[in-house]
């Protein structure tokens, strides 16, 4: 498999879950730079049913690991660093910017930053525990079959779109 099925599947699923809305369209381009049979980079632009616009860049090429999902809303930006398990909210600034040239160039200013304290557990262990609980009929933190199917459909649409380019 390539970067789309390995990584973009999770990004798309996280995006849909976080926004509470499914994808209605995707457009993607891929790159093959490392000599592998499958793609090692994909850039996806998408739109969700609720009108949210999505941009995912996923790759195996970057020499450093960067796995962030950024949601920009009317009050600020929520950044989920899925590699480190960090969640940070950057509130839009409320103070007027007195320097006109900077205000025109920058747009929204940065206000308070809140970094949420989260328990950091080993992801594969958590995944296995949830799988066990699903088999035993315990708990409620399971992905439904329809959610899993939707994630796979989006993944296939990404690959289909990329082939058309």
What are the residue ranges of the model-derived segments?
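C-terminal glycine/acidic-rich active-site capping loop/insertion
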Residues: 74-146
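Short alpha-helix boundary/capping motifs
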Residues: 43-44, 99, 159-162
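Rossmann-like dinucleotide-binding domain that binds NAD(P)(H)
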Residues: 1-64, 70, 84, 146
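Phosphate/oxyanion-binding loops and surfaces in catalytic or ligand/nucleic-acid-binding neighborhoods
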Residues: 18-21, 74-78, 158-161
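C-terminal helix-rich "cap/oligomerization" subdomain common to oxidoreductases
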Residues: 49, 130-165
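A general structural signal for well-ordered alpha-helical segments in protein cores
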Residues: 11-15, 125-129, 155-156
């Amino acid at each position: 498999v390539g970067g789309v099925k390995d990584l973009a599947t999770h990004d798309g699923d996280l995006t849909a879950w976080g926004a509470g809305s499914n994808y209605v369209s995707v457009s993607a381009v891929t790159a093959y730079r490392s000599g592998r049979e499958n793609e090692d980079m994909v850039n996806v632009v998408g739109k969700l049913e609720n009108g949210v616009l999505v941009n995912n860049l996923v790759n195996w090429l970057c020499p450093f690991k960067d796995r962030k999902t950024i949601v920009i809303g009317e009050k600020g930006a929520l950044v989920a660093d899925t590699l480190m398990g960090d969640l940070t909210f950057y509130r839009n600034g409320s103070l007027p910017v007195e320097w006109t040239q900077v205000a025109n160039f920058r747009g929204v200013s940065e206000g308070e930053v809140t970094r949420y304290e989260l328990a950091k557990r080993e992801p594969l262990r958590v995944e296995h525990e949830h799988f066990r609980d699903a088999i035993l009929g315990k708990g409620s933190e399971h992905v439904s079959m329809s959610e899993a199917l939707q994630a796979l459909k989006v993944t296939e649409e990404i690959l289909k779109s990329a082939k058309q380019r």
